[in-house]
Structure formats: C-alpha cells, structure tokens
Amino acid sequence: MNKKQLKIVTGVAIAVLIISIIPMLWISQYLHPFADDYVFGAEVYKIWNETHSFPACVQTAWNVAMTMYHTWQGTYSACFLMALQPGVFGQYWLGTFILIFSLVTSTYTLLYMVMRKLLHSSRLEYLFVSTLFVLMTIQFTWSYYDAFYWYNGAMYYTLFYSMSLFLASLLIGYQLSSSKFKKALIGGASIVLSIIIAGGNFVSGLGMGAILFAAILIMKMEQRKWPRLYITILTIYGIAFLFSVLAPGNAFRQVTIESKPNVVVAFFMAIGKSFEFLSESINIAQILMLMLLSPTLVKAASSSRFKFSHPWLCILITVTLYSSFFFAHSYAMGTRGPGRVQNIYSYLHLW
C-alpha cells in the first residue's frame, strides 16, 4: 500500500475499533457483582457504608488479601484489587471501562516501543499495525464475559496481562534511555510493577518470569554483559512470586484437587495444550487480518538492525515461552483452565 492508501485503511481501522468498543462499554451499565465479587468485596462494602472513608477501605482490602493469603490463595495484589472492586462503591460498571482501557492502552504502548523506538517505523505504520492488533485482541477474545464484564475474574487475568505489557514497555524504555534520571524513574516504576504482577495470577506470573529470564540471556549474548536492572527485577520478581506461591492458603486450596500431573508431565502437557489452543483459536478472520498486516511488518523487520541468524532457534524459544503460560494450569489441574484463563492465551498468541 502507498501512503495515501495506508492512511485511509488506518483511519477506517481506528473508526471500526472505536465503534466496536462503544457497545461493549454501553452494556456495562447493566452489570452487577457476581460470585467471588461478593466473597472478596463484602468487608470493604461494609466499611464503605459505615465510614465512607477510602483509606479505611484500602486498609480493609489489604486485611482481606492477607486473610486470603493464609486461608485460600497467595496472590496478594490480586486479592487486594478484588476486595476493592468498583461494585462495593456502587459503580460496578466502572470495571469494564478499566479493563478495556488497560488492555487497549497497554497494547498500544508496547507496540509503540517496539515499532517506533526499536524498529523506527513511521507514525502511520505504527497506528495501522497497533490499531489492527488491538482490534484483533479485543474482538478475538476467548471469553468476553470473563475478559471484561465479571470484575473478579477479568481483573485477575486481563488487568494483570495489561500490567505485564506496561512492564515490558518500561524495560524497553530503560534500555533506550540515556538520561540517568529517566533510568532511575523507569527502574523504580519497573520494580514496583514487577512486585504487583508477581502477586497476580500464576499464568502471567510464570510466563512473565520466563520472558524476563530469556531476555537476560539474549542481552548477555548480544551485549557481552549482564543487564543489571533486568537481573535485579527478575530477582525481586522471583522473591515476590515465591511469596505468593508458598502461601499457606495455596496448600489448603490444593487439597481440593484430587489429582494432578508431575512437573515433567505438566511441562510436555503445556506444550501440547498450547498447540491445541492455537489450532482451535486461529480462524480465517485472523489469518486475513494478519495477511493485511504482513507487508508493513515485513518492511519494518527488513529495515531493522535486528538479525536472526538462527530462525529455527528463535521459533523454538518463542514456542517455549508461549507454552510457559500454559504450565500453571497444566500442573495444578491438568487442564487449560476456564475461559478467563484462556483469555490470556488468546491475547498472547497474536504476539
């Protein structure tokens, strides 16, 4: 496509994206809390109605998170946010706005860092690719209800996935920054965000840890030195993630599972289930949209400074990293997980 055609197609894509999101937001006014929304939000709801003090609600939400840590699940930051769900303040519809906004902005942000900062694509090319990518991410979501409308389940996966994209954007920004002040600011924000993500779901938790580890090894091979910030973040992330995994509540919860595969079986099961999911999720609409994107992506890749002397190794690493997101549920339950979990897989497979 020439520049004029690309401009027209990009404009149409942006219009379609906006039009497609409007009804998704509109129906949020009819939502109400459901299931675990009540379990996690009851105490905060009580405090809010008694005091109308937001700081008191924050303290109560943390108390709920710590109670859950010792009795049911160790995902401390997720439980904290679950307890603070908008429904306790009478604004349950706000959850849909937060979830869609976070998914859209995080995807645009990471693609901006990749296309504009790393690949040096034009602004128009970036808008074209990122808009279609966001459109596919939203419209090809595995379970819409679990992704945008049930706060407890959606926040646990969609929001933490979005946080992971923001963290990736920050880490790229750190590498590209030459200002010590900016590096310190980005580094601090990255550490805080990594601690929050580590206290979220185990699907994103394991996958993000694997990506960080792979990034460190690749940067060591390319730059001939260890990336100190990345190692620091992975270390802090690992400690925080272990704090979540080793929670007493997880042991109580695991007792409810009658049987599960061992680590080795779960590893190969995760790889198998990743291919199984891809075979079920990729459809003709996605293929056509990827074909539409391919000329722009090929142009960006061919003009970049990045070289892939071992493409098969690159594919192997990519498949392994993608499969790492399937490991948590394969090991814990021997399945791909419910719809809210599979939303993560549907977001990721586009990358």
What are these regions (language model features)?
Residues 1-22:
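Start-transfer (signal-anchor) and selected internal transmembrane alpha helices
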Residues 27-89, 93-96, 151, 198, ...:
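Transmembrane catalytic cores of multi-pass membrane glycosyltransferases
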Residues 66, 90-106, 133, 137, ...:
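Individual alpha-helical transmembrane segments in multi-pass integral membrane proteins
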Residues 100-124, 166:
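Transmembrane-helix motifs of polytopic, lipid-linked glycan transferases
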Residues 102-108, 161-173, 207-215, 284-296, ...:
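Hydrophobic cores of alpha-helical transmembrane segments in multi-pass inner/ER membrane proteins
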Residues 114-122, 175-179, 222, 305, ...:
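Membrane-interfacial segments
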Residues 125-175, 201, 323-351:
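Membrane-interface micro-motifs in multi-pass membrane enzymes
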Residues 173-195, 231:
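Short hydrophobic alpha-helices at membrane interfaces in multi-pass membrane enzymes
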